[in-house]
């Protein structure tokens, strides 16, 4: 067998083609699908964010009880003529809110609050439709990456659960002498909305990078920052729920002073529950405290201070990250927290004026997403080039 002679000066590998790097099998064939699913998730994210904002405006305009039936499908069509409007108005006039708060309301006034609630529910239907079309479409085309279909299916299941909780919340305001929904049910509804929004955002962040990139990045994760941002997620969620409890009983309007609460640190009658003796061992007393404006407003303020303080401390740790993108994420989060503090104080001083209150709610969404973004970069750092200064 002849042996090919080689010059002693021939470079290693000369004359042979270097193998072309191939993407890992974990990503092969799914790059386009990942981009498509990510765009779909981003559309869902924007819709859910709009749903939260419209829900807040529906509450602030006291429109949430204008539709007294739950018709997930047929309710998509609003009243189209005078007869249908009159029938819808008659249903509302049978509600305790009309009898006790809005007696004498005209049809035109009813239509204004009706459209807010109908728009809120219609947006929920649109979200369900966008999810179903996207999920079934990607599933039928077999474009969902391995292991992802349960996560995407879970989003739809949570969306359906959220619709049921929404009606459960509304139904609480149609009983007895109620003129508003139960604040605890409102908090459940808003809390689940933020959970859904967070899951969508997290999955979109994961799909923004290949599986192989994420696998390599995770080897350089910054464990301390992951832990700190996880703590921040818990505190932020608690603050969101407390904010919903405040909004549910209009507690923000009762104490329009800051940093005090109507001249005192602890509001008067903070632990008073009508008809229930003050007893730390009585569950009814604890539940009653959630209806005490001073109690929930005080907790909301204290949780806000805690969130701001932790955010500042964690920002100091975040600035020590060796990755520029991670440091930038913590910078953005710190600035958003400062802005949210100002919006919170403004909401208090304006006695929850709707423009300031809704901006405060949007601020909560922004902070929620920025915390998740910071946690994502702590868990999956973007490793750049030292020469280019991107570390």
Swiss-Prot record:
Q: Name one cellular component (GO) term.
A: plasma membrane
**GO BP: any one term:** heme A biosynthetic process
The protein's annotated pathway: Porphyrin-containing compound metabolism; heme A biosynthesis; heme A from heme O: step 1/1
Q: Give the UniProt keywords, A-Z.
A: Cell membrane, Heme biosynthesis, Iron, Membrane, Metal-binding, Oxidoreductase, Transmembrane, Transmembrane helix
Q: What class of enzyme is it?
A: oxidoreductase
**Which compartments is it annotated to reside in?**
Cell membrane
- Keyword Oxidoreductase recorded: yes
Name the catalysed reactions: Fe(II)-heme o + 2 A + H2O = Fe(II)-heme a + 2 AH2
Enzyme Commission number(s)? 1.17.99.9
Whether Magnesium counts among this entry's keywords is no
Q: Which residues bind heme?
A: 300, 360
The cofactor(s) it depends on are:
heme b
Q: How does it sit in the membrane?
A: Multi-pass membrane protein
Q: Which cysteines are joined by disulfide bonds?
A: none
Against InterPro entries, the record matches this protein to: COX15/CtaA_fam (IPR003780), HemA_synt_rhodobact (IPR054616), HemeA_Synthase_type2 (IPR023754)
Q: Where are the transmembrane segments?
A: 37-57, 121-141, 152-172, 186-206, 229-249, 298-318, 332-352, 354-374
Pfam families assigned to the protein according to its UniProt record, in alphabetical order: COX15-CtaA
Q: Which GO terms describe its molecular function?
A: metal ion binding; oxidoreductase activity, acting on NAD(P)H, heme protein as acceptor
Q: Which residues form the signal peptide?
A: none
Subunit structure, as described in the record = Interacts with CtaB.
Q: What does this protein do?
A: Catalyzes the conversion of heme O to heme A by two successive hydroxylations of the methyl group at C8. The first hydroxylation forms heme I, the second hydroxylation results in an unstable dihydroxymethyl group, which spontaneously dehydrates, resulting in the formyl group of heme A.
What family is reported? Answer: Belongs to the COX15/CtaA family. Type 2 subfamily.
- Could you tell me what this protein is called? Heme A synthase
Q: Which organism is it from?
A: Cereibacter sphaeroides (strain KD131 / KCTC 12085) (Rhodobacter sphaeroides)
- Lineage in the entry? Bacteria, Pseudomonadati, Pseudomonadota, Alphaproteobacteria, Rhodobacterales
């Amino acid at each position: 067998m002849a042996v090919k002679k080689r010059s002693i000066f021939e470079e290693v590998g000369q004359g042979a083609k270097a193998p072309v790097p191939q993407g890992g099998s974990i990503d092969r064939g799914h790059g386009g699908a990942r981009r498509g699913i990510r765009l779909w998730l981003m559309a869902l994210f924007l819709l859910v964010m709009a749903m939260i904002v419209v829900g807040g405006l529906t509450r602030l305009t006291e429109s949430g009880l204008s539709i007294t039936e739950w018709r997930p499908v047929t309710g998509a069509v609003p009243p189209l003529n005078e007869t249908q409007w009159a029938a819808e108005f008659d249903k509302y006039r049978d509600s305790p809110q009309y009898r006790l708060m809005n007696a004498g309301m005209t049809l035109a006034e009813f239509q204004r609050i009706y459209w807010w609630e109908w728009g809120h529910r219609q947006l929920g239907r649109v979200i369900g439709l966008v999810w179903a079309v996207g999920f079934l479409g990607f599933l039928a085309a077999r474009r969902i990456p391995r292991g992802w279909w349960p996560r995407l299916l879970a989003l739809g299941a949570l969306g359906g659960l959220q619709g049921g909780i929404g009606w459960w919340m509304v139904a609480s305001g149609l009983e007895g002498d109620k003129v508003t929904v139960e604040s605890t049910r409102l908090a459940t509804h808003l809390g689940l909305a933020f959970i859904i929004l967070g899951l969508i955002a997290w999955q979109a962040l994961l799909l923004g990078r290949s599986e192989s990139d994420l696998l390599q990045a995770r080897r350089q994760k910054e464990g301390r920052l992951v832990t700190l941002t996880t703590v921040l997620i818990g505190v932020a969620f608690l603050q969101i729920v407390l904010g919903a409890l405040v909004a549910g009983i209009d507690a923000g309007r009762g104490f329009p002073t800051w940093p005090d609460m109507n001249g005192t640190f602890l509001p008067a009658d903070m632990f008073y529950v009508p008809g229930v003796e003050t007893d730390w061992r009585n569950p009814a007393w604890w539940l009653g405290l959630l209806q005490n404006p001073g109690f929930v407003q005080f907790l909301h303020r204290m949780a806000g201070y805690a969130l701001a303080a932790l955010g500042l401390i964690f920002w100091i740790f975040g600035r020590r990250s060796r990755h520029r993108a991670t440091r930038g994420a913590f910078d953005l989060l710190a600035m958003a927290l400062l802005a949210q503090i100002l919006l919170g104080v403004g909401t208090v001083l304006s006695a929850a004026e709707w423009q300031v209150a809704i901006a405060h709610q949007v601020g909560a969404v922004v902070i929620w997403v920025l915390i998740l973004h910071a946690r994502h970069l702590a868990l999956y750092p973007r490793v750049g080039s030292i020469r280019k200064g991107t570390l």
